[in-house]
Amino acid sequence: MRPMQGRAVLISGAGSGLGRAIAIRIAAAGGHPVVGDINDAAARATVEMIENAGGSASPARLDVTDSVVVRQVVQATAEQFGPSFDGLVNNAGTDQGAGLLDISDEQWSAVLAVNQSGPLFLSREFLRTLDVSKPREFPADVVNVISISAITVGADAAAYNSSKAALAMLTKVMQREAYEYGWPVRIHGLMPSAMNTPMMEQWHLSNEVMMAPDTVAGAVEYMMTLPPDSFVQNLVINSRREPGWPR
C-alpha cells in the first residue's frame, strides 16, 4: 500500500461534513490536508481539530465556482509543498432541492457551479501543476466525490441529480485522458449514498438510515493508499439500513 505520510492533499468543502472527516483521516495517517472551504471560520475549525489531535493541516479560502480563486489556491499550494502536493479531493457539493416547476434560475446555476464546474476547475489546475516530464515513484491522486444520485432518480432533485450525473461522466473522461495521455495521476470515482451531514437536513431522513461521514472518508483514504498499479474506477457505498437506492 502507498503511505500517506508526508503527502499534501487539497480537499474542497473540508470545513464540515464529509470534507472534514476526510481531512481528519488524512492527517491521522500522516498526511497534511489543505482544508479548502468558502467559509474561513469552518476551515480554521477543521484545522484546529486536527492540530489538537497532534496532526498538521492548513486552511485555504476556496470558492470552487471561481476559476481565478481556484488557480490561485492550487498554485499557492504547489509552491508551498512542491512535489509532496500530489492529492486532490473534489468534495465540495451543494443541494438546493426544488421541483421542476419551482426551481429558479439561481438555484439551478448555483448547484451546477459547485457540483459540476468546481471539480473541473480544481482538477484542471491540479493537473497543470504536475510535471509529466519527470518519472514518479507513485502517481498523484484525484478523488471525485460524486454521489449515488448520479445513478438514481428522485423528485425535487433535478439540479443535484443532473450535476452529479455530469460529474460521473467527467470522471470517466478524466480517467480516459489520464490513460491515453500517460499522466502520472490516478482518477478515482466515489458514489456514496446519504450521509449524516448538514447538507442532508433538508431531506429529513432518519439518522438511522444514513452513513457516518467517517465511513466514506475511510474509502477515500483507501483509494489514495492503493498500490501504484491500481485505481478505483467507481465505488458505490450504500447503507444496509435503507432498502433500495436512497438519496
Task: Locate predicted features.
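The beta1-alpha1 cofactor-binding region of Rossmann-like NAD(H)/NADP(H)-dependent oxidoreductases
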Residues: 40-41, 61-73, 105
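Active-site loop immediately N-terminal to the catalytic Tyr-X3-Lys motif
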Residues: 101, 152-158
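C-terminal helical subdomain
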Residues: 185, 189-190, 205-245
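Conserved glycine-rich cofactor-binding loop
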Residues: 8, 15-16
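Substrate-binding pocket helix/loop in short-chain dehydrogenase/reductase
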Residues: 99-100, 104-112
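Residue(s) in the substrate-gating loop at a strand-loop-helix junction
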Residues: 147
